[in-house]
């Protein structure tokens, strides 16, 4: 090789070396801090400014950036005390490639942007909590390339598109994956490795989306899963037997289109609510028994056929004897007679030329004449009827609810529900005393008349001599409502959903004892009217977010409405549409979230509730606020049951309850001790 050639090679080598050094310098100069500030912040924030993300700037120490945690390559966390050393100034940290993002936690942070593709570039990122925001767009493929990620919560956003298959790349580390309450759709992708078991995965929540297709059977290979939620999607077909093998502690398959026989879950605690809202053909414990089994083995089928053939002779002979005996009967019971018999809790029926009165416990003294001749005074009008205060001939009063024509289901569907409602007796529920149906189909529900004020008027109306509402009194009202709801949900063989919880449907007496009205009425209404009730709940601010899709109330939607009601009690603010033209909407949970972010939580409480309170924390106000926000969680499975709500309210009573026993004290009369 000549000298010129050697010189040429030396020059080439020199330039390659310079280029390599330049590239290395560039890479070392780019850090997770720069990436977060340059790409992630703008993408997540969107068009509206987030108070949390405002701390992400060069003038604020990196360790004080809100919603993030940092760690060095050696595993030691970044502490603010480190900034006392010159080597840990913001300038040096911005360029330090050994500083890594460990956790991104920004729930309820008013994020209106999208998930950036660059999120996959954080090599040591372990947790991403971006739930309860307004993020849109798709889940980037690159999220599945974050090799250290173990906890992901993207619930309660507006993410759309399909779930990228790369998500299952995280299987080795993933412990919890939640995307509940988005607009994701399509068939769930299977892991690339056919035998992938996602051994560490414990929580998988894909509910509240639009996923379709058959049950994703690969999930049955995830042996470590303890909590599985596929609710409120459009899955269909059979639920695989393999699901029964998993050691699940929580399961929700409700509001899909699953059919056939459920697998054997052994001695599980799953109730019917875990499977409600599917195809009527879905059967097996805890639902109705299956008429025939689609899972029988060939041997079992053969045995069943032989048994049926041998039993056919016996059945035929019994049937002949029964028919011969039937002919000898002198009278045949009508369908109505059969429908109205054998009701142990029903006191009796009183029939006349104008219709039929079915009376329940406490309504024994009512007669048809009493009901038809009572003089009425309109108390309230709703989309499905009118409530009257009716004066009886003996001077007593009853409350009559006349159901609007066309609102109620047919008699055969309506009467069993009416009878169930007539059996309910609880001190925090207004009892149904009787039911009247006229010859022309008119229907009346008859209740005790209670000359009490509604909670709505107590909180929001300015009336003379209205009692002061200190915290002790508000707590008693809230606890009474919770107890009534808990009884509806768990105190019956068949749970009752209230379906219309609002402050107008709570009556409060002079001693601040609360009673719920209008429970269970959606069950007797035709679907169009039931939908109207749900729409009104949205207008009034009590509608649970999942009802946008399924429009069928359930215990969890009752819990959500109770959470709004508890916030209304604590804050003294009316939820829902407001203003002269109803063009403003008051979202109570959002007001609380904003106050928490701005560190002004104490300002959300009604001043009247705060009177005399030295420590809202000790008096249970702050705990009640947290409980209310838990009830209002966008993800249904996060919400507590009403039994748990009652327990928490009982355990966190106001310390000074003396003001409960002064019912005559009013806002204008005296200073409340609270």
UniProtKB/Swiss-Prot annotation:
The modification Phosphothreonine is found at residue 375. Pfam families: LRR_1, LRR_8, LRRNT_2, PK_Tyr_Ser-Thr. PROSITE patterns: PROTEIN_KINASE_DOM (PS50011). The chain crosses the membrane at residues 296-323. GO terms for cellular component: plasma membrane; plasmodesma. It comes from the Eukaryota. Residues 331-350, 649-674 are annotated as: Disordered. Residues 373-674 form the Protein kinase domain. Residues 1-25 form the signal peptide. The modification Phosphoserine is found at residues 334, 454. Glycans are attached at residues 57, 90, 95, 110, 183, 195, 252, 257. Its main location: membrane. This is Putative kinase-like protein TMKL1.
